[in-house]
Regions:
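Acidic donor-binding loop of glycosyltransferase active sites
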Residues: 307-321
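A charged, aromatic-enriched C-terminal amphipathic alpha-helix characteristic of glycosyltransferases
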Residues: 17, 228-229, 361-365, 374-408
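Short hydrophobic beta-strand element within catalytic cores of glycosyltransferases
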Residues: 311, 335-338
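Acidic anion/phosphate-binding donor-loop and adjacent secondary structure
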Residues: 202-203, 212, 217-238
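Short alpha-helical donor nucleotide-sugar binding micro-motif in glycosyltransferases
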Residues: 296-297, 304-309
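Conserved donor-binding/catalytic core segment of Leloir-type glycosyltransferases
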Residues: 191, 233-251, 257-261
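Nucleotide-activated donor-binding/catalytic signature segment of Leloir-type glycosyltransferases, i.e.
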Residues: 280-300
């Protein structure tokens, strides 16, 4: 097949999980013998991604306009025309290239784009976050998971104390956007990276079917090479805990360290890889001989550090849709500690052995489990092919080959 992958998150020097997922998929599709090109943002050449940007096809940098603010911050309200305008622009760009491909697969943050594509275009989008009904994409506000379906409540996400006009205009923007997204999902094929995302969207939009679920995936061959290299190193003394996360409230790193610090056992060392708006404060509060902050780390270094640890902690307090860091921890053979929320419980199917994914209802119980856990615990390998990009690519190819516009179950 001739396949066009589309993502405004590519290319950038430090790419997030969505971009890496799309590139990983592109490489898997090329390995399977398909022609794959990538339509991305026009801000940088693909070279800024380094080795991560190599996928075996042509890069087309044309997507633009999605960073426009429309003075929403200045006015303290969401503007109803903003997201339809961005979606129309993306659709226009996509349609310039659609005749050259058998299928278009979109990975991005403009879920209403399908609303502006003709029904005969074979278009698939993967939803990686909760941006189908939440302008913040996270369903997380004031340190708590947000489960409100009232569009008027969304006004507080741009202005904590909206006046009547701001509240009414923001509500109108959310109502229109959610309606357009629902029309998009009805008109074209939609993939969710977890059942959690599908359920949460149905909470606002009503019963579906809204799409099908294909979990995130990883390059298991690459991970197993990293794992093997780590196994050849001499064992380190102590209990080494590794966290890779952006340092801001939703990721829960500060809450985890706050709970752990008073109980930190002698010999336990916690290494945090990642940067973010809370990094400076967290360094000042927690950094010491047993808690170290590395700042942003390149992906290869991050995986090497994870492979050398005795345990992985993914302390997110928001509803992670399908955390790649959890998958990486499991496939590296590590006990992986996380909260029982979001799409994370679904990832227990990727355990090598029962109990490898250690889920907890709150941070206190997670920390209690961690500080009493045997750092010498080892896990085997998950079933061959499970969670790998090549298997997911075959699932997605089945969706690609189904008729345009319909829902497809895998």
């Amino acid at each position: 097949m001739r396949i066009l992958i589309v993502s405004e998150d590519i290319p950038f020097p430090n790419m997030g999980g969505l971009a890496k997922h799309a590139l990983n998929l592109a490489r898997a599709l090329v390995r399977a013998g398909h022609h794959v090109d990538l339509l991305g943002c026009d801000e940088h050449p693909i070279d800024v991604c380094g080795e991560e940007g190599k996928f075996g096809g042509r890069f087309i940098g044309e997507l633009n306009g999605h960073h426009a603010g429309w003075k929403e911050i200045s006015f303290g309200m969401f503007m109803p025309p903003k997201r339809p305008s961005i979606a129309r622009n993306f659709a226009k760009i996509i349609l310039r290239h659609a005749p050259n491909y058998d299928v278009i697969h979109y990975h991005g943050h403009i879920p209403n784009v399908a609303r502006y594509l003709p029904p005969d275009v074979n278009f698939v989008q993967t939803r990686h976050d909760q941006g189908g009904d939440c302008f913040r994409h996270t369903r997380f506000r004031e340190g708590q998971i947000c489960d409100s379906i009232d569009p008027a409540e969304c006004a507080k996400c741009i202005n904590p104390t909206p006046n009547a006009i701001q509240r009414a205009v923001s509500k109108a923007a959310v109502v229109r956007f959610r309606r357009d997204v629902a029309q998009s999902f009805r008109a074209h094929k939609t993939v969710f990276v977890s059942d959690l995302l599908s359920r949460n969207f149905a909470r606002c939009a009503g019963p579906g079917p809204w799409g099908t679920t294909v979990h995130n995936f990883v390059d298991r061959n690459a991970l197993e090479k990293v794992r093997h290299a780590a196994s050849l190193l001499p064992p380190r003394e102590g209990f080494h805990v590794f966290i890779a996360a952006k340092l801001y409230p939703a990721k829960g790193v500060e809450q985890f360290l706050h709970a752990l610090a008073p109980r930190l056992p002698k010999g336990m060392v916690v290494t945090v890889a990642g940067d973010g708006p809370d990094e400076k404060r967290m360094r000042e509060k927690f950094e010491g001989s047993q808690i170290e902050f590395l700042g942003w780390c390149a992906p290869d270094r991050t995986l090497k550090l994870a492979s050398m640890a005795n345990a992985i902690v993914v302390p997110s307090v928001w509803e992670e849709p399908c955390a790649t860091t959890v998958l990486e921890g499991l496939f590296l053979g590590k006990p992986t500690f996380a909260l029982r929320r979001g799409g994370t419980p679904e990832l227990a199917v990727y355990e090598a052995e029962p109990g490898q994914l250690r889920l907890h209802d709150d941070m206190a119980s997670l920390v209690s489990d961690l500080v009493t856990f045997d750092p010498g615990t080892r896990y085997g390998f998950a079933a061959e092919g499970l969670g790998c990009a090549d298997r997911a690519a075959q699932q997605l190819l089945e969706i690609y080959r189904s008729p345009p516009g319909g829902h497809h179950r895998v």
